[in-house]
């Protein structure tokens, strides 16, 4: 447990450029405090001291604003940045080297006593306010955008955004492989605009050719528009 706590502090120093030294992170980072409490509560839970485990978890929630159920399974080098509002449910499973921001929920959709929370594989980044719900699996090296609501399995090396969450990129990217945060997210709006700009020269060429064809056939452009509108109305009726 001590080694895990040490790793949790060190990963916070690696991930957060504002972290200055080991002591500062250990004493002043609520995400680290919540993890230390969780590690202790999880040990108590495994020894079947369930009430004490829940009591420690509840105390940590009051102090840090972060709720982690003591039965959840969390791997090594886990970092919660800022932390406030994070909720990790009872049957959640989190791999190694996972990085989440404030307001993230790993929640359940069912009320039955079974696996009802998500499984997060290694090297996943989850943006602020994202909701990952249900007994789904999020593959390794995936990045989930801020405010997304993820309800289905996500393949590894994916980028997920939106409500409901959708995969906008899937595959290995050198930028994403080397990135620890969200800065390497592909921008779907920018991509759509790029596609439109790529198509624009071809469309202009086709319009010029169409105008030339109309001119050669002695058809006025305005008349052609009127004819086309009448044709469309006839098809609709």
Regions found by a protein language model. Give the residues of each.
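Terminal amphipathic alpha-helical/low-complexity segments used for targeting or macromolecular assembly
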Residues: 1-61, 175-237
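Solvent-exposed, flexible loop/coil residues
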Residues: 31, 36-39, 72, 78, ...
């Amino acid at each position: 447990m001590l080694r895990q706590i040490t790793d949790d502090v060190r990963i916070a120093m690696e991930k957060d450029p504002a972290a200055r030294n080991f002591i500062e992170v250990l004493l002043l980072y609520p995400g680290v405090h919540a993890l230390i409490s969780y590690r202790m509560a999880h040990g108590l839970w495994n020894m079947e001291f369930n009430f004490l485990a829940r009591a420690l978890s509840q105390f940590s929630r009051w102090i840090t604003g972060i709720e982690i159920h003591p039965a959840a399974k969390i791997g090594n080098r886990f970092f919660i940045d800022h932390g406030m509002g994070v909720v990790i449910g009872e049957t959640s499973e989190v791999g190694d080297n996972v990085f989440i921001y404030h307001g993230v929920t790993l929640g359940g959709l069912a009320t039955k006593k079974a696996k009802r929370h998500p499984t997060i594989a290694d090297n996943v980044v989850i943006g602020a306010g994202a909701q990952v719900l249900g007994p789904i699996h999020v593959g390794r090296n995936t990045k989930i955008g801020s405010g997304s609501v993820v309800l289905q399995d996500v393949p590894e090396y994916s980028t997920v955004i939106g409500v409901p969450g959708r995969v906008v990129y899937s595959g290995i990217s050198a930028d994403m492989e080397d990135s620890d945060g969200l800065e390497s997210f592909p921008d779907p709006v920018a991509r759509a605009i790029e596609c439109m700009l790529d198509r624009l020269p071809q469309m202009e060429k086709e319009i010029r050719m169409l105008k030339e064809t109309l001119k050669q056939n002695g058809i006025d452009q305005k008349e052609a528009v009127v004819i086309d509108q009448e044709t469309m109305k006839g098809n609709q009726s």
